[in-house]
Design a protein with these regions (language model features):
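Peptidoglycan-targeting cell-wall enzymes and recognition modules
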Residues: 2-26, 52-143
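N-terminal carbohydrate-binding/catalytic regions of secreted carbohydrate-active enzymes
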Residues: 16-48, 168
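Non-transmembrane alpha-helical segments in soluble domains
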Residues: 33, 51, 140-141, 165, ...
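Short, mixed-charge amphipathic alpha-helical segments
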Residues: 37-42, 125-131, 156
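Acidic helix/loop microenvironments that form the catalytic cleft of cell-wall polysaccharide enzymes
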Residues: 54-57, 152-174
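Proteins synthesized as precursors that undergo proteolytic processing into mature forms
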Residues: 135-139, 146-155
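Low-complexity, Gly/Ser/Thr/Pro-rich intrinsically disordered linker/tail segments
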Residues: 167-200
Length: 200
């Protein structure tokens, strides 16, 4: 992995991921500093919004795999449900095989195929690769970029961050935690807070 200017230090990342042992945080530092550049998540407002979201989704880098019940929602990952069709799950067992993995959970055969093309790795044949720090990070940065979230992060307002959350989550689940993380990471990265809505 080529060396690029660091966007994050180890001390910053461990402070951001408070409660997570440093030995669990360290494997993510190099992939983050690389893929944040690759996907142009490379300014303090972009980094803050991205990290706040992935820290919420992954429990401060503790989890890279969806906890499987299966819950009633997860049972709908299996064909022939409408949700399974949307996820591209066509074969029995696809729901469990293609459960959410990565720092922003990639879910479903279709999305695994898409990220396989983007990252030149066969995650359909080897889905657990997305649990590894390198690919968990790369897939999250890919997801962020493909959903057009950098321009929203540039606004650096609460309303823009709310729109980012909706685009990632489909709603506002965990909003209070996502917002608290965003504000705290902004402070760690030295970003001044802006009004809730940008001035026209």
């Amino acid at each position: 992995m080529p060396e690029l200017p660091r966007l994050l230090t180890f001390d910053q990342l461990t402070e951001i991921c408070r409660g997570t042992p440093p030995r669990r945080v360290e494997p993510f530092l190099s992939p983050l500093n690389h893929y944040l550049h690759v996907y142009e998540i490379n300014t303090p407002p972009r980094v803050a919004a991205f990290l706040a979201q992935i820290c919420h989704e992954s429990g401060n880098l503790r989890w890279t795999r969806e906890i499987w019940g299966p819950t009633p929602q997860q049972a709908r990952y299996e064909p022939p449900s409408p949700l399974a069709r949307r996820l591209g799950n066509t074969e029995t067992g696809d729901g469990h095989n293609f459960l959410g993995r990565g720092l922003i959970q990639v879910t479903g055969r279709y999305n695994y195929a898409q990220v396989s093309v983007a990252l030149a790795q066969d995650f359909v044949a080897n889905p657990t690769l997305l649990e590894q720090p390198l690919w968990a990070t790369a897939s999250a940065c890919w997801f962020w970029s493909t959903r057009g979230l950098n321009p929203m992060a540039d606004e650096s307002t609460e309303d823009a961050y709310r729109r980012i959350t909706r685009r990632i989550n489909g709603g506002l689940n965990g909003w209070a935690d996502r917002l608290e993380k965003w504000r705290r990471i902004q402070a760690i990265l030295g970003i001044e807070s802006r009004p809730r809505v940008a001035k026209k």
